[in-house]
Every structure is written in C-alpha cells, then in structure tokens.
C-alpha cells in the first residue's frame, strides 16, 4: 500500500521526488472542452430566455459564524457523536445550535478548549485544530489522542454524548493565501498532523491553488497514523502535487515505509532544497520533534531561533513556521 512512500535509500526517493516536481501533464483532447463550452452557452441562452437578460446567478449563501474572536467569550457546544479511530484516538463531533452556521475557523487557526476538573482551582485550557471542513455547517470535529496524565485529552475521551465543552476562538496561526508559496513541506509527528491536514485540505479543495505539498509524518505504530485514509485519498487524487512519507518507530513486519524517527537523511532527500525560492516548511508535533527538527517556539507569538536538522541543512528562520 505504501510502496510509493518507501524510504530505502536517498537516491530512489530523490528520483521519485524529481519526477513529482517536474513531470508535465499529459496532453488531452480539446473536444470535451468545446462540448462543455457549447453546452454552457446553450444554458446561458435558455436562462436569459426564461428569466430575462438582466437576471443574475444566485449569490453564495453568507452563513453565520459560531466563533468570531475578539471579545466574544466562551461558547458551549454539545457533543453529538463519538467515533473510535484507534486504541487511543477518537473523533468527537460537536454540534452548533444553528445548524446552518459554520465554525468561523480560518486557515490556519485553532480553537481553545476549557474545562474545570472537580475540586480544581483553575480550569484546564488546551488548543485544538478542528479536522472538519471550515465550510461545513452545523458542527465541527476534533480528532483527539489521549495522553497519560494529559488532563484535557483524558477529559475529552471520558465525555459522553450530550455533554458540553467550552470553546473560544479562533486562534490565528499562519495566514494562508492562495498560491502564497510554490512548494510547502509539512513535518508532523502524532497529533501534529491536524493543522497540517487543515492546510492540505484547503489547498486541494481550491481549484485555483497550484501549491505543491510534501508531507513527512512520523508515528510510533501504524495505528497511530491519524487521518490516514483522508491523506491517501488526496495523494491518489493529486499524485503530481502531493507526496507523503510515513515513518514508524515500531513498524510491523510488512511495513514498507520509513522506519525510526524523522531524520536528517530523509529530510535532505524529500524536502525542497534551501536555495529554492518561494517555499515554506511547517513543523508541528511533540517537543522532541521540535527539538530535533527546528527548535522550539519561545511563545505562541515568538517563533524563536531556528536550530536542529533544518538549520544544519541550510534553511533560514524565514523559511520555517512552527505551529
């Protein structure tokens, strides 16, 4: 299944990556285009005949937004569905009171969650990136992996349908614009895939966005790979623009992807070269990943200095963004 993503040595991967970067689309017949143009013209003519020359197409629906930021305060949402994805991961769906409203979450941003444990003096706050589409009305989804001694993830996994959770936001991260970069690389570990998936989905659902995307995603076991089907579907649909490389610390015998931790040899092989113009590298994952790859952030508003593997490979601070 992962034959195209196997990390055997640097040279085969580099050849695959070069082909992905330079292969031209195959020529196609123009007949379907002419047919489509003709049918479009006919449709416009019939529309004007029945509704008049001054008629215009219906404007897109402007939906209310659940989260507006600023001084809005906390919004309580009811848990409506629970889907078990693996031994330690669930997809939780929280519904909006207004079933026609959208979340108001932007690319790339997150929501702050809050709950107060019984007997505790302070509430627990944690940011989460929704995995549902930003244009989806009626609800939002969180993919949550439970961590030992992680108070918020343990609370979320203990929740039952019809219970409520407090949200606030959105919390803006990186302001994405169509074709802002020619090529982006995403380096993720564990649940760090969620903001990456948010960005990937936005790029490929926009027909005007031609950005190339390379994903390097590390996990402990195969069951830990979050959003696996969604990522594979996108890679199969856009093979010339999206490549994903998976690594497992504890792979099964039949695993054909990368083994071990995200390392310098792999990144040197699959990432765009530092000298390439108009590129950006995004990093998100546990502290150990940041330490090894890019260095940690100082604060949510301070990216800190670039260090680790990316600095060793010759990238500069402006080429890297740490979620």
UniProtKB/Swiss-Prot annotation:
Q: Per the record, GO CC terms?
A: mitochondrial outer membrane
Phosphoprotein keyword on record:
no
State one molecular function term (GO).
Answer: cytochrome-b5 reductase activity, acting on NAD(P)H
Q: Which UniProt keywords apply?
A: FAD, Flavoprotein, Membrane, Mitochondrion, Mitochondrion outer membrane, NAD, Oxidoreductase, Transmembrane, Transmembrane helix
What reaction(s) does this enzyme catalyze? 2 Fe(III)-[cytochrome b5] + NADH = 2 Fe(II)-[cytochrome b5] + NAD(+) + H(+)
| CDD domains to which the protein is assigned, alphabetical | cyt_b5_reduct_like
UniProt cofactor(s): FAD
Q: Where is the signal peptide?
A: none
Task: Give one Pfam hit by family name.
Answer: NAD_binding_1
Q: Which parts of the sequence belong to the FAD-binding FR-type domain?
A: 72-177
Mark the transmembrane ranges: 30-46
Explain the purpose of this protein.
May mediate the reduction of outer membrane cytochrome b5.
Q: What is this protein called?
A: NADH-cytochrome b5 reductase 2
Species name: Aspergillus oryzae (strain ATCC 42149 / RIB 40)
Record lineage = Eukaryota, Fungi, Dikarya, Ascomycota, Pezizomycotina
């Amino acid at each position: 299944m992962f034959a195209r993503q196997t990390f055997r040595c640097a040279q085969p991967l580099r050849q695959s990556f070069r082909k992905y970067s330079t292969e031209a689309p195959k020529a196609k017949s123009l007949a379907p285009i002419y047919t489509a143009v003709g049918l479009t013209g006919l449709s416009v003519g019939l529309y004007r005949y029945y509704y008049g020359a001054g008629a215009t197409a219906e404007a897109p629906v402007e939906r209310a937004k659940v989260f507006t930021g600023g001084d809005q305060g906390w919004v309580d949402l009811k848990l409506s569905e629970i889907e078990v994805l693996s031994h330690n991961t669930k997809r939780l769906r929280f519904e909006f009171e207004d079933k026609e409203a959208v979340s108001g979450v932007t690319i790339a941003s997150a929501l702050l969650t809050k709950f107060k444990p019984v007997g505790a003096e302070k509430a627990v706050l944690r940011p989460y990136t929704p995995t549902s589409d930003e244009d989806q009305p009626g609800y939002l989804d969180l993919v949550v992996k439970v961590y030992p001694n992680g108070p918020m993830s343990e609370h979320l996994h203990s929740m039952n349908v019809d219970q409520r959770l407090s949200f606030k936001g959105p919390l803006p991260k990186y302001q994405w614009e169509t074709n802002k970069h020619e090529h982006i690389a995403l380096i993720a570990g564990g649940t760090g895939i969620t903001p990456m998936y948010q960005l990937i989905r936005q790029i490929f659902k926009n027909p005007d966005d031609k950005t190339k995307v390379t994903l390097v995603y590390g996990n402990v076991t195969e069951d830990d790979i979050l959003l696996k089907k969604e990522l594979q579907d996108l890679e199969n649909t856009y093979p010339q623009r999206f490549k994903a490389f998976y690594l497992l610390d504890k792979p099964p015998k039949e695993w054909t992807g990368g083994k071990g931790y995200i390392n310098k040899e792999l990144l040197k092989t699959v990432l765009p070269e530092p000298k390439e113009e108009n590129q950006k590298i995004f990093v998100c994952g546990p502290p150990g990943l940041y330490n090894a790859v890019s260095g940690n952030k100082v604060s949510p508003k301070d990216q800190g200095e670039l260090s680790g593997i990316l600095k060793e490979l010759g990238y500069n601070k402006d080429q890297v963004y740490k979620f």
